[in-house]
Amino acid sequence: MTQIFDSVSFLKTVTHQPGVYRMYNAEAVVIYVGKAKDLKKRLSSYFRKKVDSEKTKALVSNIAKIDVTVTHTETEALILEHNYIKQYLPKYNVLLRDDKSYPYIFLSAHRHPRVSLHRGAKKRKGEYFGPYPDSGAVRETLHLIQKIFPVRQCEDTVYANRTRPCLMYQIGRCAGPCVSSVISDVDYAELVGYLRLFLQGKDNQVLELLVQKMEIASQQLKFEDAAKFRDQIQAIRRVQEQQYVSEDSQEDMDVLGFAQENGIACIHILMIRQGKVLGSRSHFPKIPQNTNAQEVFDSFLTQYYLSHNEARTIPSRIILNQELAADVEAIQLALSDVAGRKVQFHTSPSGSRGRYLKLSNTNALTAMTTKINHKMTINQRFKALRDVLAMDSIARMECFDISHTMGESTIASCVVFNSEGPVKQEYRRYNITGITGGDDYAAMGQALERRYAKQLDVEKIPDVIFIDGGKGQLNRAHEIIAQYWGDWPKRPVMIGIAKGVTRKPGLETLITVDGDEFHLPSDDPALHLIQHIRDESHNHAIAGHRAKRGKTRKTSALEGIEGVGPKRRQALLKYTGGLQELKRASVEEIAKVPGISHSLAEIIYQALKQ
């Protein structure tokens, strides 16, 4: 630090009101954001002569400036603190590494409603059920729904262009509303009504209705219908046995388990909606050294619930451990304010709630132990690689790969690893253009130029660069990167990874820029790390290539037609249900598409027939 922060003069200007403070270092970077009920009292605590916390000592030694924002209430301060943490990602704050939105089950407002997975903003007309902990839980529920309530799950464009029921109808997974002779609107609406009640958690109401239906069908000697209702009843009861917490509880709850050890904290959330367990998820926030459990937990609570602040995602009850409830009153008030209803925290649960809290704590401990073991494995692999490459330290590695099919839709990928493993938010794909199809050297050169030609922050310069390829690829990569590393404070080690003759894992040949080749034993931890980063790069490239190839093949036939831009292409595909259906359409059918004249329809028809 170039100067010592004058805390005495600063504290004279601070008020006793609630608010938020931002601490900056000498480079004017925000290093900590905090909130307080009494700003003067809280900020004074940092500058006492005797401070026990090592984290606080380290923080104070780096302070060059403090900004203060006064708020009307502590709740306002809490929300503002959360927004600042999201904006600045300060070094000394606990950071929740979770930018994923939670998935829902969506029931559309269509004449014949469709049920599907939904993630993101709720813009479409219809009903949303959830949230679910992950897409796997949603797909499992949708699979179950298909068996009990065969409401359609096909896209509207597919539905609109059916002339006879699809395979899903044949195997009993769809009622077939696309064909009017299969099921009436009234019967389909009744089926959707059962599904709606089921997703709302009103299983017993559905059971009562189905039992009545079964008895009526039996009395009328419609035994096939009665058997169908019986199967639905049995399936719902099996689901109830698997999911219900208690028969008398129909409330929404989150049960939060907690574990912390060796600089790693885990919060395990068990999600219960309408009395049913939807699933669970473990979270591992990024925590500064010497951060106590209370601060970790409070920071997590705020960031987790305010990041997903739609009213439906905040349950009416949150169950947590007694020893972590010291300072949650302000958080409870803030969540109630955001949700628009009272949110209650329970710290001494009994009965089924107590059992689920114990289970959640056990899951948190198990997940944390697994994480620690994984970290130890990664550390061992990094140490082995340092020994193999004779390097003092490896903080960052990058790996490049190229993917294409016979030169079509070429994509390059770059993946990043640090000492904790993959850094997926820094993965990148490069759309390769302007080269001869199949020229991997040119593709690699273009990707590396786009990656390294721009100015890099020091911490973004890799210690090791892996190239998935042989000597030619590595030499080309070295030529490109050598143009840019003149101003770098360090020069990365470059290694080529050539597959063995049989392309079998464990037989890879490693190549240096000097042309030396070497192999590692198949059980060597260093080789396992190299295989890991190579496979990540390979999979990332293939995923991008397949997506690009699929998009190209779907639209390329229309892209060359004069007068057909993106909007008309979209209208054509949406109206007809896809490219193959469009190719089979007549001129008159194409002319029915909104925005397509008869003369343009003839041009499109002739172009697609070539």
Swiss-Prot record:
Subcellular location: Cytoplasm
GO biological process: nucleotide-excision repair; SOS response
UniProt KW DNA damage keyword: yes
Domain annotation UVR: ranges: 204-239
Limits of the GIY-YIG domain: 16-94
Cross-referenced InterPro entries: GIY-YIG_endonuc, GIY-YIG_endonuc_sf, GIY-YIG_UvrC_Cho, Hlx-hairpin-Hlx_DNA-bd_motif, RuvA_2-like, UVR_dom, UVR_dom_sf, UvrABC_protein_C
Principal cellular location given in the protein's record: cytoplasm
CDD domains, per the entry: GIY-YIG_UvrC_Cho
UniProt function note: The UvrABC repair system catalyzes the recognition and processing of DNA lesions. UvrC both incises the 5' and 3' sides of the lesion. The N-terminal half is responsible for the 3' incision and the C-terminal half is responsible for the 5' incision.
Subunit-structure text: Interacts with UvrB in an incision complex.
Record-stated family: Belongs to the UvrC family.
Protein name: UvrABC system protein C
Gene: uvrC
